[in-house]
Amino acid sequence: MAKLQVSLKARALRYLSAREHSRQELARKLARYAQEGDDIEALLDTLEAANFMSEARFSESLVNRRAARFGNSRILSELKSHNIDPDSLTEIKAALAQDEVARAREVWTRKFGVAASDANGRAKQMRFLLQRGFSHRAIQAAMRAKEENED
């Protein structure tokens, strides 16, 4: 029995029903199934016109998924890799900056819970947060606030 051929539009809608996708990401996924004569860009334009796909919704979704675990630079880097509009990135950066210290403190608390007793332990904790994309300023503020709470 032959498999039914799923149209590109149906495949795109299935992807979009699971989660928001950027234009670039959806084009890459659909390119695997495109046949000669298929116009992926026209399909993506149609999906955007019908409001099935939105750069703003994708950005908001990605920020919401990543904010609990990662810092501003990691989130912004991922958004840049999806070719998000630079004006949107500026707005997102401003919004993320407001609570970066609190998010760094939350990530640090989940991972470590207590302040390190020596310099090596403190460096390890700082490296962990740096790898997660938090700024030096946010890391120092988060760790300083935690140490003050323990005293």
From Swiss-Prot:
InterPro entries: RecX_HTH_1st, RecX_HTH_3rd, Regulatory_RecX, WH-like_DNA-bd_sf
Keyword Cytoplasm applies: yes
Keyword Cytoplasm carried by entry: yes
Keywords, sorted A to Z: Cytoplasm
GO cellular component, one term: cytoplasm
GO biological process: regulation of DNA repair
Coiled-coil region: none
Subcellular location: Cytoplasm
Family that this chain belongs to: Belongs to the RecX family.
Role of this protein: Modulates RecA activity.
HAMAP family named in the record: RecX
Name assigned to this protein: Regulatory protein RecX
Native species: Herminiimonas arsenicoxydans
